[in-house]
Every structure is written in C-alpha cells, then in structure tokens.
From Swiss-Prot:
The gene is MT-CO3. Gene3D superfamilies: 1.10.287.70, Cytochrome c oxidase, subunit III, four-helix bundle. Its main location: mitochondrion. GO terms for biological process: mitochondrial electron transport, cytochrome c to oxygen; respiratory chain complex IV assembly. This is Cytochrome c oxidase subunit 3. CDD domains: Cyt_c_Oxidase_III. Belongs to the cytochrome c oxidase subunit 3 family. It comes from the Eukaryota.
Length: 261
C-alpha cells in the first residue's frame, strides 16, 4: 500500500453508482408497467437490484470508514456538507409538491366545482389516523435524540434501546400509512386532489422507509461496536435525515390533511 501524506480519501472505482442508477430506472419503469399493465416483473427486478446495490455499497463505505480509517476529520467534514446539501435538495423536491397542492387548492378551477376539496372527494379525517401518525413521528424524533445523547455519553445499552424504538415507530408509521391508503375513498387517478395527495404523502412514506432502513443499518453497526462518542457520522447523518422526515410530515399534516380537508 502506498504512503498517504494528506487527509483526503481517494475513492477507488466503484460499480455501485451505475448499478444504483440502473435499479432506479428499472423501478420507475416498473412502476409505470405496474400501474398501467398490472405487471410487477420490472418493479420487483428493480427492487432486487436496488437492495443488492444498497447492501454492497453500504458494506464498502463501512469498510472504508470503520476498518481502513479513510474517514478522517477532514473527510467527515466533507461528508457533513454533502449530507446538508442532499437534505436541501430534498426540501426543494417537496417544495414542488406543496406548490402543486396550493396552486390547485387556493384557486380551484370550474372543473373541480370551484371548491376544495373538489366535488365528489371525501377527504380523510385529520383527527384520526393522520393525527396518530403525527404523534408517532414526533415520538420517534424524541427517541432518535435520546439515542444520539446516549451515544455521546457512551451509554451503549440505552443507545440501542432508543434506536430500536425509533425503528419500530418508523415501521408502525409505514403500516398506518398503508392501511390509510387502503381505506381511502379516492385514488391517485381521482384528479388533482388524488394526484397531489398520493404523490406528496407517498413520497414522504418512501423517505420514512429509506430512513428506517438507514437507522436499521446503524443499529446493526452499533451491535458490532462500530460507533464511538467522537466517530459516528453514519448515525449522525441518519438522525439528520430522520428529523427532516419529521418536519416534512408536520407541513404535510397541516397543509394537506388539516387545511386541505
């Protein structure tokens, strides 16, 4: 191995960005095939390649950061900037969905009956499952902060407990959201209301699944003693992401469920 005289990580060539992009193409094309032709082959193939890519890419990052020591303070600083920029890009993603919702709801067209919700749409009661979902996500925000503080204080047992509770709450939220979708009287094809509702809440639901997976990886890593009180950027990034998901849900709840109904 050559001697390195700088603090930066020269990343080796990796196939995972390419396989990840291909899996994303398969999943999006597969969703179109599933929605229009009721064929699940492509979307399942996309999910499989995505899971395989995710596993191997995460394995490489863990190997580089934990076992090879490539994640120096300078590299960690760069990773932090990267995560912040990624979350900002996600904010703009959701801004587009909120824009579509408010554009349609603040000045409803005659085709919608000149009112919001549109004529014939029976919105979900914001005081039932959506309120429970809000409580679940707010509680998970508390438990992830508890996990972070426990890690900083070197309390491994409490960190694992808090992280497990957070992941469980994330899974519970996903199940509640799935049951809500199943029971909704309208679908994604029911005009602009159905489109904006399912696109915004569905995209948020996808982020909850991604965040839960991220936290589950952190849980497994903590079981193997990968984190210390001063070297745990993987967990820190997951916690930031989870707080972002929390905040987006509050905006969704107030805008789409409460005001929009």
């Amino acid at each position: 191995m050559t001697h390195q005289t700088h603090a930066y990580h020269m990343v080796n060539p990796s196939p995972w960005p390419l396989t990840g992009a291909l899996s994303a193409l398969l999943m999006t094309s597969g969703l179109v095939m599933w929605f229009h032709y009721h064929s699940t082959i492509l979307v399942l193939l996309g999910l499989l390649t995505n899971i395989l890519t995710m596993y191997q890419w995460w394995r490489d990052v863990v190997r580089e950061g934990t076992f090879q020591g490539h994640h120096t303070p300078t590299v960690q600083k760069g990773l932090r900037y990267g995560m912040v920029l990624f979350i900002i890009s996600e904010v703009f993603f959701f801004a587009g969905f909120f824009w579509a919702f408010y554009h349609s709801s603040l000045a409803p067209t005659p085709e919608l009956g000149g009112c919001w919700p549109p004529t014939g749409i029976h919105p979900l009661d914001p005081m039932e499952v959506p309120l429970l979902n809000t409580s679940v996500l707010l509680a998970s925000g508390v438990t992830i902060t508890w996990a972070h503080h426990s890690l900083m204080e070197g309390n491994r047992k409490q960190m694992l407990q808090a992280l497990f509770i957070t992941i469980s709450l994330g899974i519970y939220f996903t199940l509640l959201q799935a049951s809500e979708y199943h029971e909704a009287s309208f679908s994604i094809s029911d005009g602009i209301y159905g489109s904006t509702f399912f696109m915004a809440t569905g995209f948020h639901g996808l982020h909850v699944i991604i965040g839960s997976t991220f936290l589950a990886v952190c849980f497994l890593r903590q079981l193997k003693f990968h984190f210390t009180s001063n070297h745990h950027f993987g967990f820190e990034a997951a916690a930031w992401y989870w707080h972002f998901v929390d905040v987006v849900w509050l905006f969704l709840y107030v805008s789409i469920y409460w005001w929009g109904s």
